């Protein structure tokens, strides 16, 4: 019989360990009907006892993880695998967790030209089985943000330039001349904008039968109004410019928009939202956070 060192009594018996497991396991999985090349962390706690063992049997957990590759990931499947983790270490563990990270590729339509292109959304899916079972889904959504203050300053410059160019003729200018000026000189200053990120982490409603990852992305992109595009023709770029002009926002505005929409999302029991505007004006980022614990307390 081969020796089983893991099952022998360890040093400092009686000392429990809060988590023991494996990280960065490669698994091909299916999330929302899409293939994801994932990195998986999986582990359990190790309880203290008079006969405490050196460690866990990691190969048992590794083999059980293969069940995640046999179909679309659902809350029920995650709970089943976590329960199997505990059964595989009967009496030695009462907590188990799985964390799945990867990029979800979605085909997104252009704003105007009816083309489609692919966009990657980084996500992390965390499932824990302790006294209760919880699933947390975190997704990163890229979008564009245009500074309201910069837009106001740009409009002010345009007004000054208009007055300078036309002087006392302002009250009797032909519409055609004004239109020509706007086309040629109507933007003497431009507001600054930047690629931005919304990191939305939600705790799923316990009744959830599937992972609402696409719904989460759609909710966020509609609320923000300026989702980063894939394929872009000139008409799409113009539509994108209009969208940015109609959705001027500081990071605080973006956080509040997301708060309003996810407070009403049927699949969301609680959330933690972080928005990051990667400033083009500054060498630092502008960041806002908002948390909701399923009550009226928001911080």
UniProtKB/Swiss-Prot annotation:
Reaction(s) this enzyme catalyzes, per UniProt: GTP + H2O = 7,8-dihydroneopterin 3'-triphosphate + formate + H(+)
Function as written in the Swiss-Prot or TrEMBL entry: Converts GTP to 7,8-dihydroneopterin triphosphate.
Stated family: Belongs to the GTP cyclohydrolase IV family.
Keyword Hydrolase: yes
Top enzyme category: hydrolase
An annotated GO BP: tetrahydrofolate biosynthetic process
Domain of life: Bacteria
Name of the protein described by the UniProt record: GTP cyclohydrolase FolE2
Gene responsible for this protein: folE2
Species name: Citrobacter koseri (strain ATCC BAA-895 / CDC 4225-83 / SGSC4696)
